[in-house]
Amino acid sequence: DCKVINERINKENAKNILSDHDILIDCVDNFETRFIVNDLALDLKIPLVSGAIGKFDGQVSTFLNTKDSPCYRCFVPETPPNAETCSQLGVIGATAGIIGSMMALEAIKIITQAGNTLNGKIFIFKGLEMISKTIKLPKDLKCIACS
């Protein structure tokens, strides 16, 4: 079953809401919630598929939360200065569709154990140029969440 949670996640309710799931798919638009979801996924050893969009660009990554793999905080250790939300940047529906479909595919690969996931990598999509690239995400040995 797929369960959509239409409730704001915070430190107080996250474990109660998210702990009974096989995969967490992070579709939030702020760093505070991303950090809460990442930290809980690590604590409970639940795979996390994370995606982000802004106008024409997007990114997808998978964090399997194994001993040797990076977590979201290895990639973004703290909220970037001047971080903008989707409401500030604007959202193009087609970009959300592309990134959302890729996130769904990552979840399917985890469930079926088919192919290789983006664990330890990030897929970056540039919609205006119609280019994409996948880069490696190294584990931060000084990460406050997973090291």
Predicted segments, located by residue:
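Conserved acidic residues
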Residues: 3-8
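Glycine-rich phosphate/adenylate-binding loop
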Residues: 1, 12-147
